[in-house]
Amino acid sequence: MKVFVIPYYLWFGYVIIPVMYLFFKSREEYWRAFIFLSTGMTVFLIVSTIWPNGHDLRPAYLLGDDLCTNLIRSLYKTDTPTNLWPSIHVYNSLGVHFAIIRSDLLKDKKWIHNGSLILCLSIIASTMLIKQHSVFDVMTAVLMSIVMYYLIYNRDVVTTYRANREAKKARIRY
């Protein structure tokens, strides 16, 4: 399934474009997405520092000289199979998808919601199909994203933090 290298590379734009859109259009929604993504990346860096990890799932040789095979070869050369757990591709893809579907700015744009879901699931599948991540890497990233979804969107830690900060400022003034 070497064609799945394409959604793997699309991940970069999939993360950057919606985050930049939210930055310019809705600071509150941007901060939710930012906290979601940066928390996951921080956890990833801490885990990788404390417990370096990797896998040996990749094939020894890749046959073929087509575009997708060459993209996979390039990926294998530049992105070693180390420090993979939990999968940042999976976690950030889910984080961006959650930001899109929970955005007030995009609530009436079902075609964006559907396109985001398809790309998100394609990216998640790609991480395993091109042998970049194991099922364990993917499932732990999914679990992490579920926990963060609850904190960011159900508990709304951003609004709670702002309210507490404003209350503290008000107490200091009086």
Model region roles, listed by residue range:
Residues 1-15:
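Interfacial helix-start motif at the membrane-water boundary
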Residues 9, 13, 37, 41-45, ...:
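Alpha-helical transmembrane spans of integral membrane proteins, capturing the lipid-embedded, hydrophobic core
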Residues 14-18, 94-99, 118-126:
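Hydrophobic, membrane-inserted alpha-helices
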Residues 61-62, 81-85, 122-149:
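Interfacial helix-loop-helix junctions of multi-pass membrane proteins
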Residues 97-102, 145-153:
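Hydrophobic transmembrane alpha-helices
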Residues 108-121:
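Short hydrophobic alpha-helices at membrane interfaces in multi-pass membrane enzymes
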